[in-house]
Amino acid sequence: MKKIECIILDWAGTAVDYGCFAPVAAFIESFNEIGVPVTAAETRAYMGLTKIEEIRALFNIDRVKVAFREKFGRDYTDEDVQARYVAFQRVLFDTLENYSEPIPGVVDTVEALHKAGIKIGSTTGY
């Protein structure tokens, strides 16, 4: 039987911030900053897209399009998408520590893997 040499852990949204609350909060806040709110349900509907594509998708929600047009007197542009992406990143990294608690057992598991000489790789969506 072959020995396990390496495992890959998905951190954000799985081993840490189980449920992906950090990006949801960052999307909500980045849109609130311009007075065009989005909901948690709306942000969750597009999870799995890249963050910039999710922002585009949020801007394309009819209610959000109307709110943006009423607020700014025009349709959104790619510059608006880019600006919300920059805002999203800023908010995410400013608040990430609030969502950094590992799920129960992760720290002990990582320590046990290290002691067993098993390498750990990482992946994350944020």
What positions do the PLM features span?
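N-terminal helical cap/lid subdomain that shapes the substrate entry/recognition surface
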Residues: 2-107, 114-119
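Conserved phosphate-coupling serine/threonine residues in phosphotransfer and NTP-handling enzymes
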Residues: 124-126
